[in-house]
Amino acid sequence: MQLYYHKINNLTRYFILIIMIVMIIGITGVARCGKDTFYSILKKFLEEKQLKSQRLAFADDLKNELNSFTKDKFNIDLFKCDGTDKELVRPLMVAYGKCRRSQTEGKYWTSKLDIKVENLLKDNIIPIVTDVRYIEYRDDEYSWLKSRNGILIHLSRKLDDGSIIPPANIEEKANDNKLKAVADFSICWETCQDTNFLYELMQKNLRNIYDRLRLN
């Protein structure tokens, strides 16, 4: 009878492990630090461990709301622009996002992701939010992530001269150091266009993140 109990107990722990490994991951860092690039290599690493993941971003919903305006007024598609055009409309996006957040004490954009996150978790897919930026309100993006047993990865990037890419605006400057201080992982990587090289370079960090997933 005791042996049977131990078998059941071990089986229970096994299923708990399977359930808890499917959690939410957030990536934070200033603009141009490589958050989407890091997501791509993290996704590849998790796939090698037989874990599915999918990118989510608060900014995608923001772009959906603003895109018709920017295309009409500036001939800029927020989902396709880069370089000069992206920097041109960035202040507009920041201001619009801030207005929505101020009206809801930080909950507007997180509420947009709630259903998407739930659907992914039901399918055993790990949601990875690539633009966690705010820790101002009680229920802000960081608190939302943690309320879901999430882990936060802070990313920064070195330039060729050894300096770190600075915040792009006042909003980033006010939040980035705070988010770095509470992040579960803080990673600083080199500027490099070779994602395969970055993948090999980040192996230790990727293993640490994977181990943390298994512990939660």
Model-derived features: positions:
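P-loop (Walker A) phosphate-binding loop of NTP-binding proteins
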Residues: V30
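Small-molecule kinase domains that catalyze NTP-dependent phosphoryl transfer to phosphate-bearing small molecules
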Residues: K112, D140-N216
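Conserved lysine of the Walker
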Residues: K35
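Hydrophobic positions on the alpha1 helix immediately C-terminal to the Walker A/P-loop
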Residues: F38
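ATP-dependent small-molecule kinase phosphotransfer cores
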Residues: F58-I125
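Hydrophobic anchor at the beta1->P-loop junction of P-loop NTPases
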Residues: I27
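Post-Walker A helix-loop "phosphate-sensing" segment adjacent to the P-loop in P-loop NTPases
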Residues: K44-Q54
